[in-house]
Structure formats: C-alpha cells, structure tokens
Amino acid sequence: MVIQSSGSAETTGADGKRPLVFVITGESNSGGVGLNSDATTVELQPRSSVLILDLEADGMPLVPLQLGKNNLRKHVGLENYYDKYHGLENELANAAEGGVLRDRSPLYLVKTGHGGSTIAQWHPDASTGYWRQFVQRTDAVKKQLDGELEWVVWMSLGINDAIAGTEPDTWQQQVAEHLGRIQQQLPGARVVMTEFQSMGYPETNRRIRRLAEDLPQVESVETTGVPLSDANHWGYQGLKQVAQRLLQKSFRKGE
C-alpha cells in the first residue's frame, strides 16, 4: 500500500478488503482527556497502523497517528489539551497493531468532534459550522483514498444536551436526523454511539438505546463500570474500555 502526500492513494490491501475508515465525532469525549503521561512507550510512538487526517497541514494529508502531535487538533473546547491528552484513537491503534483489526491495517481515522457541543450545534444551518467541518474532513479522506470505502462512525454526544435541559423527544429526533445526514455523507456507514451509564444520564441513555433499536446501521454501547477521570469524562483506562466495547459493536458477525 502506498500513501501519497497529495492526490489519491492505492489502497486495496493484500486481503482485498476495502479501506476501513473510522470517524470519531461528538462532544468532548470524542476528543478525549486521557493523559498521554499514562500511555506506554509504544503508545507514544508514531503508529503507522493508523493514518489520521492531519487537520493542521495543507490538504489535510493522512499521516501516522502520534499522541500529542496530531491526534487532538482543531477541537473546540479542548485547545489547552492538545499536546498532553488523547481519546479513543489510542486503543484503536492497539487493535490495529495486535488486536482484532490487525488484518485490516492500516486503518484510516478522522476526528471531528467539539467539546461542549449540543445536537443543535451540529445542524447544517448552525453558526458553529460543525457539520460543514464534518463534511470537509470526511471529503478530504475520500479524495486521498481510491474506490469504495468502509466507514465506521463512533459518536459520543448527549451529555451537554442533558445538562442544558434539551427536551428528550426533541433531542432524539434531531439526533436521528443528524445520523441520517452522516449516513448520506458516508455511504454504508455503521454508527456506534456511546451511552453514559458511568456518568449517569439515564434518560439520555434510554433515548440512545431507542435510536439504536429504531435506526438501521446504528448501535450503542453501555458504559457501566467504566472508570472516569472526572464527573463527565473517561480517562486513560476508561477510554480503552469504551473503545474495546465500540469495536465489539462495530462489525457484523462474519466480517
């Protein structure tokens, strides 16, 4: 496989499978507040098993993931965390190197979340421009990878709406519409949402489960017992556990 600095890449792996692209989106837990100082020496090295969209470089090329260097950038609300923190991408790289996804390496990754965000702020007409960025970033991957892509979206969203008091029926409907836009932008995408049992928010969890029951290609993972770094965020170990649960739900049997 050859990755080029511009243009497109020859991306058909030796196993003949489509390039596998992960998109991590939502609020601050999609960016992540796992301490890099807790990571292993291997986890702190450049990880060629995961090629992440470099949001700060011209053309947003795909480059090897490295915690503290390119894993957490252009994420509203986490600007002071860029060099010292990470999210779900760390365990994704572990899975690509020696775990359940080792036969799909390299994986491709787009991070496009924003801290403090509510579902209304992800509407295409919202002044935040969050949806426009989602489209721009995923389009940048499409331009660099030839052929049909396999998309998996991990979404962690709902805490800020619960805190803000967004009416649950309204929230559920708006999230359903948002998921529809995601699946239109990313054909065939499978979406896995995080629930928030480890933080609380029982009504939000119930609505997420209902979305997973009602919508095609949408799943959710419960997070009971997952350790936190504070009241609303998973830390180093918690992010590993959540990522492992997300991976288990990301693929149908036989894939």
What are these regions (language model features)?
Residues I3-E255:
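Cell-envelope and extracellular/periplasmic
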